[in-house]
Amino acid sequence: MTFKPFLTDQEIASLQIQEAQSDKKQKRTPEQIEAIYTSGTNILVSASAGSGKTFVMIERIMDKILRGVTIDQLFISTFTVKAAGELKERLEKKITEQLRLTNDTALKQFLSEQLLGLQTADIGTMDAFTQKLVTQYGYTLGISPNFRILQDKSEQDLLKNDVFDDLFTDYRTGDQAELFTKLVRNFAGNRKDSSNFRQIIYKIYDFSQATDNPQRWLLENFLKGANTYKDFSAIPEQEVKDFLNTLQETALALRDVTDLEDYKQVTAKGTPTAAYQRHLKMIEQLQDWVLHFDSLYGRDGLGKLANDIATLIPSGNDVTVAGVKYPVFRSLHSRLRGLKHLETIFKYQDQSLPLLQVLQSFTLDFSKQYLQAKMQENAFEFSDIAHFAIQILEENDAIRQLYIDKYHEVMVDEYQDNNHTQERMLELLSNGRNRFMVGDIKQSIYRFRQADPQIFNQKFKDFQEHPEHGKLILLKENFRSQSEVLDATNSVFTHLMDEAVGEILYDDTHQLVAGSSAQKIPYPQNETQVLIYDTKDQQNQDLAVEDDSNQISLGEVKLVAKEIIRLHNEEKVQFEDITLLVSSRTRNDGILQTFDDYGIPLVTDGGEQNYLKSVEVMVMLDTLRSIDNPLNDYALVALLRSPMFAFDEDDLARLALQNLPDQHKQNLYEKMENARNGQGQQVQLITEALSAKLDAFFETFLSWREFSLLNSLYDLIWKIYNDKFYYDYVGSLPKSEQRQANLYALALRADNFEKTGFKGLSRFIRMIDKILENQNDLADVEVALPKNAVTLMTIHKSKGLEFKYVFILNIDKKFSIQDMTSPLILSRQNGVGIKYIADMKEELEEKLLPTVKVSMDTLPYQLNKRELRLATLSEQMRLLYVAMTRSEKKLYLVGKGSQEKLGDQYDGKSENNHLPVADREHYLTFQDWLLAIEAAYAADELHFKTSFITDEDLTEDKMGSLEAEQAYDADNLKDNRQSDDITRALDMLEAVEKLNQHYKAAIHLPTVRTPSQIKKFYEPVMETEGVEVMQTSYQTKPKFELPQFSKKAKQDPTALGSSVHELMQRLHLSEQVSLEDILTALAELSVEENVKKAIQVDKILHFFQTSQLGKLIQANADKVYREAPFAMLQADPASGEDYVVRGIIDGYILFDNRIVLFDYKTDKFTNSQAIKERYRGQMTLYAQALSQSYNIQQVDSYLILLGGEKLEVVEI
């Protein structure tokens, strides 16, 4: 058939005009049309929040299909598995809809093929694709195709730690032992062990894994900064400019302060005040140094200039005028901190280079040995698989060319969250002019996963400045939020985000625009609100705001609860329409408790990390620790005090005194043994009741210890549950469902642990303890949640979602700057920067002390730290953008602080329509940004209102309460019309039942069926033997069987059947299939040896050598298709409804005028006719699917029967 050509630019422009003039209720925007139909070049779609990017992707894919591009010619990368599933589902609906609408037979056939190919199309995460690629071509690198993924962090840590420990020992005793010891001590801090150094190595390793070639980055970039930034001449030009700008801005800020009305410039006698003279001198001197920097100091004199400035200006940040503090010198002091010591730092910085070279060597060796350890386990991390895939494509031009030729277009969603590994993969798959990238740099919030928004940003600038490199399309229209939300968001980011801090300029290019007229209808009551809990009265109370401002206060939660009660009662807002957004999953217990107190239903996003801290799990872990090592007193006491044994304090005190007379340092377990045997020093304290408790404990405990030696962890845990009824016990406690789910999950996690290859109770306990030691936890187990409830989730989890009412909580929480205090900071460009601990004994001429250790920030460290700070602030801005753009109707931002103090904190300054760079760099909370913007700009252009809420506003009488629905009084039927309601309800139930009966077939019809399910539905009874007339009893007779050491395990027919199918798929077809070909394919199977031995190779060879079908397959090897998936619409005769049949065809030969279908069967049989009838329905479906797909009427069907005494080929 002939397909329509792709649209030209002129045709696209014409279509845009037609769309604008149409009477459609929801019109596509000109930019959406451009993004859907443009072809023949690289395209970057910058899609703002709520702009319909998924719609654009779906429409573009469908347009390509309707113009003759097959679904397997498209590579579509999504950020999550869920997103891939949703994309496939929507595409399936679109293709099915097109099938129904068209009457063109050829197009129907083509669309059916696309529907069939959808399930195996390359639509998914990059991880999924690289796994498939490495499975297929990993042999070029010597990688077995049956590798597994190391997804469990605990398993990764066990392997990492083993490799690190061995390598650490080698270096500590090797040729560079002295230098290595100095390196470890440089990062040791206050600790005396290697734990800090271990974390440094893991940090470098993880960072390098996000590059496209970790080893190359470690070799070429790791020491780049250390080798470059050795003296003043190496300081980047931009850093010098920024420093001089800070001097100029400080002088101007000081001038502004001296011009204030309340600033006292002259005395009563009319002479300048001393302060004014001093400040004037500072202003003149700072401006003179800026003006004559090159002649007075130059780049080499930066250190001297910094010291001269430090001498000139006061040590504090503020200038106080009329009681108000103005932070004039804050930015300058921040800049001086590193510069004024640079001369000294440069004297010692060279000493750090040999240490960094050892660090580089150790990290390279660790990376290689860790990979070797994973090779031995045949288990890899996702990053390993991605790098293998890159290596395969870079080293094998033929394989790469296969993919380049295959893909008409390489599409990627959420492009702003790509890392450099993923970007390299996209480059290798593309022909250089067929990439389609969709994303929004303002929503790049995964830097902690090594995502780099600069990949998007650089592409954005490149296409903007060089249109010949690709087309940039901007989707600005937002179809999600009302204008109140959009205006508030724009008013914040217009003054907050630029290239200096934010990485992009938030101008007309990025501002949100309402996409429909309905969104522009004003709702003044929905104006965005900033609600701040006033902490002025909370300083001396138990529930006071903690010094740690990261903790959400009770006052914040109460004001949110009050507003939700008002929304629910007065505006009839459903709880499910309200969402609370927080920065992290931890420390939200106060929210849960307060909402519970006020009866507001609340559900979380299920990502809390408190699993190991739940009481029932802690009890079980201590039980396992005790079984593993009874001499662990802490664990044993916890077990004894648990409900399983219920020893009280008095019992434990008596037992604690039962040491042997000559041994005073015995463990509790040994003392218990002494008491049980009557040998304790204070045996008279052991009462009869306590003795009985001891006997019962030892009987159970020893049985557990014995059981643990010969059985799995899973069985041991369930034995503990059953022996002491602990699982049933927690079922009687509050939140029983959650508690029982936690215990059940513990057993499953233990089982999964052993399935990964790690065995033994000791190793499992060690893994759990390591998780807790690193202050980590496992996610809570999900249980059924109420539907109509307020949702609490993290901002990260909310990305891509939308909610009617949104509360962003804890906006006063400080951004995490922990990475900026680390002794080592990494940069993709500059490599490593460290804090170096130098011995300054000679410099300070110290004679009494053996050493004088001083920690100094090397220049690479200072540059990396500044880069990291700006990147962190930019990411936090994007996080705020994501949070604000989740709301559809109304947005609340909630924080806390003293109204009196906050009022004096912001100076109301702005520059270039933005908050000053220095202020934006200094502020470390969302709240600071919002209040600083409010102080600097007029209220009518901000579109948000700030209110301070006091404790007086949150008294119980003002909080309100939820209006409960009144229940019917069963004893008072007057005027309540209850009988009418019951009658009406019964009538409705009767009507529903009639509908159920009428549409019974449709109700029970599944949307998707497999051929096997349909086969079973129609399958006749083959024989009467073995048919049970009555159901047999489930009670089994007691029996004892001797261990069958010499007997062979019974062969699983399913495993055998799957293996035969895989062998026939892998088998290389030629004009003459040989025994060697079959054995080669057999060797490639990733199955147990006993399964391989069960495959009857002689029958397969006989099939190809003697049967007409086997010879036909060999003669037409180029026309043979194997393991071909299909999907087909079928009408159910009972209900008249359509459903989808999906399956996989073993193989077929495609001729011009006919198709030969064949299927392998390994079923045991004596009568081939019975097998033929059993599979007739299934083969008919296969034939029907092929006939529809290729529009060929003749389909000859054959069964290849391998399960009998001899090979048979039967025609159906």
From Swiss-Prot:
Residue sites binding ATP per the record: A47, S48, A49, G50, S51, G52, K53, T54
Protein name: ATP-dependent helicase/nuclease subunit A
Family statement drawn from the similarity comment of this UniProt entry: Belongs to the helicase family. AddA subfamily.
Biological function: The heterodimer acts as both an ATP-dependent DNA helicase and an ATP-dependent, dual-direction single-stranded exonuclease. Recognizes the chi site generating a DNA molecule suitable for the initiation of homologous recombination. The AddA nuclease domain is required for chi fragment generation; this subunit has the helicase and 3' -> 5' nuclease activities.
Entry keyword DNA damage: yes
Residues covered by the UvrD-like helicase C-terminal domain: 510-800
EC number: 3.1.-.-, 5.6.2.4
Catalyzed chemical reaction(s): Couples ATP hydrolysis with the unwinding of duplex DNA by translocating in the 3'-5' direction; ATP + H2O = ADP + phosphate + H(+)
Superkingdom classification of source: Bacteria
Oligomeric form and interacting partners: Heterodimer of AddA and AddB/RexB.
GO MF: 3'-5' DNA helicase activity; 3'-5' exonuclease activity; ATP binding; ATP hydrolysis activity; double-stranded DNA binding
Ranges for domain UvrD-like helicase ATP-binding: 26-482
Organism of derivation: Streptococcus mutans serotype c (strain ATCC 700610 / UA159)
Keyword Transcription regulation recorded: no
Cofactor(s) recorded in Swiss-Prot or TrEMBL: Mg(2+)
Entry's Gene Ontology BP terms: double-strand break repair via homologous recombination
Keyword vocabulary terms for this entry: ATP-binding, DNA damage, DNA repair, DNA-binding, Exonuclease, Helicase, Hydrolase, Isomerase, Nuclease, Nucleotide-binding
A GO term from the CC aspect: DNA helicase complex
